[in-house]
Amino acid sequence: GACGLMQLMPATAKWFAENKVRIEYSEEMLFEPEYNIRLGCAYLDYLKGRFDGNMGSVLAAYNAGEGIVRQWLNSSLYSADGENLNAIPYPETENYVERVQDTYDMYVRLYREN
């Protein structure tokens, strides 16, 4: 399953570390907070670029995988325009996206008030 603070899947983390950010990788390193956060944040930034900053798609891809989100975006069942998800067929991913977006919105409101 997913490892460390950023809950990275080992296969995805290995591919990303070795092919995109070109840093050392071992599954044990995923349990080192500094390494895990560094790799997880870099992966989120990578997904942000791949999905043109569309945070719904970025978060869905972080949770379910980039390939499956691309399939959803190419399906009229889940996307009317190929850029935005109208529906997410995985309940876990749908809940994840909603929770993260709700938490983000809460922090935006909190920091605007202060």
Where are the language model's segments positioned?
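Substrate-binding/active-site groove segments that recognize
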Residues: G1-I23, Y35-Y43, V100
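Second-shell loop/turn segments in exported
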Residues: A2-C3, I23-P33, L47-G49, E83-Y90
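Non-membrane alpha-helical structural segments and their capping/turn regions in soluble enzymes
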Residues: L30, E34-R38, G56, E94
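A general structural signal for short secondary-structure boundary/capping elements
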Residues: E32, D52, D105-R109
